[in-house]
Design a protein with these regions (language model features):
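Short S/T/G/P-rich N-terminal loop/turn motif that feeds into the first structured element of a domain
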Residues: 1-49, 53-67, 74-99
Length: 99
């Protein structure tokens, strides 16, 4: 079942986020089961809204790629994750926009 993952990383900077994105290579090799990913900041906290094929796919990406990348870069941000069953995931066209 598809899920929406709401993720908060307290205190991670935009530079750290960009370094993690580069280290994991998720733009070149999208995570298995990842459907969409959006990121924004509120104050010093990084927020993400993702659509995934399943919680298991999200957790596998975290264990196999995200966690190791953060550890390698010395980033110690705790992920606060809540999952919600997706009623609909609509992606009219593939697009990647980065600032």
């Amino acid at each position: 079942m598809a899920v929406v993952a709401r993720v908060v990383l307290n205190g991670i900077t935009k530079e750290q986020y960009d370094a993690v994105r580069e280290e994991t290579g998720w733009l070149k090799e999208p995570p298995v089961g990842g459907l969409s990913h959006m990121t924004w900041w509120e104050g010093e906290d990084c927020h993400n809204a993702d659509a995934w094929e399943s919680e298991e796919a999200f957790n596998a990406f975290g264990a196999e790629r995200l966690g190791p990348a953060m550890a390698k870069l010395g980033i110690q941000a705790e992920l606060q994750v809540t999952f919600h069953p997706a009623h609909e995931v609509y992606l009219p066209q593939p697009v990647t926009l980065t600032v």
